Amino acid sequence: MSYKFPDNLNYADTHEYVLEENGLLKIGVSEFAIDQLGDIVFVELADEGATLEKGETFGTIESVKAVEEVYLPFSGEIVSVNESVIENPELLQSDPIGDGWLVILKPESKASIADLMTSEEYQSKVVPK
């Protein structure tokens, strides 16, 4: 399978992607990681308004193969939760970077996206040459 690695995304070591928009961070899970999980059957996310620290779990994704936790790459307040993904977990497989985003975070302080991997760096980490 060929994966998409859009240039406007940055990635954490734990496979979450971050898209910065107007000072807010849209966070989801990479297409590569979702593909590794197989068929997604259940998604649970933290509540809107929750304030969490960098590295804390903000949800779980359950597939036929495994249950994986998802982690915040930055501290902040969750200002929006994608209810569509909770109701239709298959959105994570069909469109993980588009409609399959998980949460929108208002970072505690100016988020340093530079601390994350670029799309190119992430791609070289997960896709064998």
From Swiss-Prot:
GO terms for cellular component: cytosol; glycine cleavage complex. The modification N6-lipoyllysine is found at residue 65. Keywords: Lipoyl. Binds 1 lipoyl cofactor covalently. One of its GO terms (biological process) is glycine decarboxylation via glycine cleavage system. PROSITE patterns: BIOTINYL_LIPOYL (PS50968), LIPOYL (PS00189). Belongs to the GcvH family. The glycine cleavage system catalyzes the degradation of glycine. The H protein shuttles the methylamine group of glycine from the P protein to the T protein. This is Glycine cleavage system H protein. It comes from Prochlorococcus marinus (strain MIT 9301). The gene is gcvH.
